Amino acid sequence: MFRSLFLAAALMAFTPLAANAGEITLLPSIKLQIGDRDHYGNYWDGGHWRDRDYWHRNYEWRKNRWWRHDNGYHRGWDKRKAYERGYREGWRDRDDHRGKGRGHGHRH
């Protein structure tokens, strides 16, 4: 008898903590609602109003979560142009590096 009363009291005490995924009541007068829509059909994501296709344009589902589109960098692609890549590598190969006190490549 005592166990069942204790269990019933515990269930009644923890009932307000349960909330559905769309709405969480923080205080009696404050509600947190993720996924609300305005009259144009835009979604509220917690910081900005986003249109319906925002997530599919800017994010992709990979490895069990949403990732921002990175234009193939996650596959190891280097999207810089070959000219820029060669220019930067050539700049690093210079012997003077135009450092302090070196002038214009002259060894003083």
From Swiss-Prot:
It comes from the Bacteria. InterPro entries: DUF2502. Residues 1-21 form the signal peptide. Keywords: Signal. The keyword Signal applies. Pfam families: DUF2502. To E.coli YaaX. This is Uncharacterized protein YpeC. It comes from Escherichia coli (strain K12). The gene is ypeC.
